[in-house]
């Protein structure tokens, strides 16, 4: 069934920045995808094309990327008469059309929009939901696995004010019996946390960050973890709710001295207090002994390979690579070879096509890694990643707090999928790291 039209436009993400939306039209109708974007981006990511014209949107316009879809990609794809069900052929064609290693000619944001919209057209042509189409493309077994929602309830780092260095603190309702129960538990803890934050830090502490988490004026990780632990207790889930962190430590790594500055938001930070990677690793272990931490993302800087390997050898929780791996097959291969981490953070816009995202997950599974499908801080109402998490049996999804519609859109989509699948799906629960084998 041929594609009759491909059209891109500039729309807005959840931060009010422009992003690319792509419509693909076939006989089954109109299929639409919107591309997200990140705030703290890894330097090894596929190239997000921005206009750079400071007089419009502060240089963040995407009119070039939109034009690349409408003038270059659309006519070429339509002329090629590609089968929308054959995603790997579609994505291979898009990569060749761009011709660069990191999609910098046409823009990863242009290519991804087309890739995802065509995937939706492929699912429609097969008459199946998107998650089922993705499951076919990835060759995952059944039953479907519904992911544990890692909910980012408290923000620090580059996502917030205050001196708190670590970027995200997440609650992990892995002991819940189902996805819908997990979401309820998460929402209840989140409401308690908001109330507590306002009580302890003043009314403005209830204000939410880019991903829906609260961002009180917190100074240390212990202070943040104590607040979350208290919220879990008040909601009645002590012992049933775990915690995860995204440290995003590349943001406070001092490469010239190979140290980590936990006071990086202070211009007068005392360099004698900066930590070596061994000291930072000890801090993580101390925190994990005091709090129910099951997962740490980006504990070290993206090119501090030695630190990652050291930590991997000496700890037993999930170590997630995001800035380290940037969903890039070469970086994932290196991380596997150097034993740097044991889980991949999968962000489709870091690599730029659905096929490469699926391959990144499969490469990770092959080495017994976990895979966590992730949103970006600049999100939209597009819910594709919910279907990707279910289709890949990843068992874990990170898509913000149970607040702000662009975050809830994904979680609500998984609720619908749970309802639709009924007994044909299982909740990953405590086995989120190995759910692909369930």
Curated annotation (Swiss-Prot):
One of its GO terms (biological process) is glycolytic process. The active site is at 211 (proton donor), 347 (proton acceptor). Coiled coil: none annotated. It comes from Aspergillus oryzae (strain ATCC 42149 / RIB 40). This is Enolase. Mg(2+) binds at residues 246, 297, 322. Keywords: Cytoplasm, Glycolysis, Lyase, Magnesium, Metal-binding. Substrate binds at residues 159, 168, 297, 322, 374-377, 398. Its EC number is 4.2.1.11. The gene is enoA. It catalyses: (2R)-2-phosphoglycerate = phosphoenolpyruvate + H2O.
């Amino acid at each position: 069934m041929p594609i009759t039209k491909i059209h891109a436009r500039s729309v807005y993400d959840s931060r009010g920045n422009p992003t690319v939306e792509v419509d693909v039209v076939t006989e089954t109708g109109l299929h639409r995808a919107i591309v997200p974007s990140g705030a703290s981006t890894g330097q090894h990511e596929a190239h997000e094309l921005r206009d750079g014209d400071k007089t419009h949107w502060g240089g963040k316009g995407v009119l070039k990327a939109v034009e690349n879809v409408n003038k270059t990609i659309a006519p070429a794809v339509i002329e090629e008469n590609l089968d929308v069900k054959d995603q790997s052929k579609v994505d291979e064609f898009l990569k060749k059309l761009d011709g660069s290693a990191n999609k910098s000619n046409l823009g990863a944001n242009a290519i991804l929009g087309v890739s995802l919209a065509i995937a939706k057209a492929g699912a429609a042509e097969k008459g199946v939901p998107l998650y089922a189409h993705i499951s076919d493309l990835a060759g995952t077994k059944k039953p479907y696995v519904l992911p544990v929602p890692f909910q980012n309830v408290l923000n620090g780092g580059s996502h917030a004010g205050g001196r708190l260095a670590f970027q995200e603190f997440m609650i992990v309702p892995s002991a819940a019996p189902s996805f819908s129960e997990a979401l309820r538990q998460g929402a209840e803890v989140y409401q308690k946390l908001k109330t507590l934050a306002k009580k302890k830090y003043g009314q403005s502490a209830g204000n939410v960050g880019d991903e829906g988490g609260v961002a009180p004026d917190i100074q240390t990780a212990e202070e943040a973890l104590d607040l979350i632990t208290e919220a879990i207790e008040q909601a009645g889930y002590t012992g049933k709710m775990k915690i995860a962190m995204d440290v995003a430590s590349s943001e406070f790594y001092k490469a010239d001295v190979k140290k980590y500055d936990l006071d990086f938001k202070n211009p007068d930070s005392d360099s004698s207090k900066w930590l070596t990677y061994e000291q930072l690793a000890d801090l993580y272990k101390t925190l994990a002994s005091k709090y129910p931490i099951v997962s740490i993302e980006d504990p070290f800087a993206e090119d501090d390979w030695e630190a990652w390997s050291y930590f991997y050898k000496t700890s037993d929780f999930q170590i997630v690579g995001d800035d380290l791996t940037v969903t890039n097959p070469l970086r994932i291969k290196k991380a596997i070879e150097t034993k740097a981490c044991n889980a991949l953070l999968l962000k489709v816009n870091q690599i730029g096509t659905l096929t490469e995202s699926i391959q990144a997950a499969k490469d990770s599974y092959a080495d017994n890694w976990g895979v966590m499908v992730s949103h970006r801080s600049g999100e939209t109402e597009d819910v594709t990643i919910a279907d990707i998490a279910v289709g890949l049996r990843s068992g874990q999804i990170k898509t913000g707090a149970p607040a702000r519609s662009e975050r809830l859109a994904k979680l609500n989509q998984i609720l619908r999928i749970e309802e639709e699948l009924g007994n044909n799906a299982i909740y990953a629960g405590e086995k989120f790291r190995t759910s692909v084998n369930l």
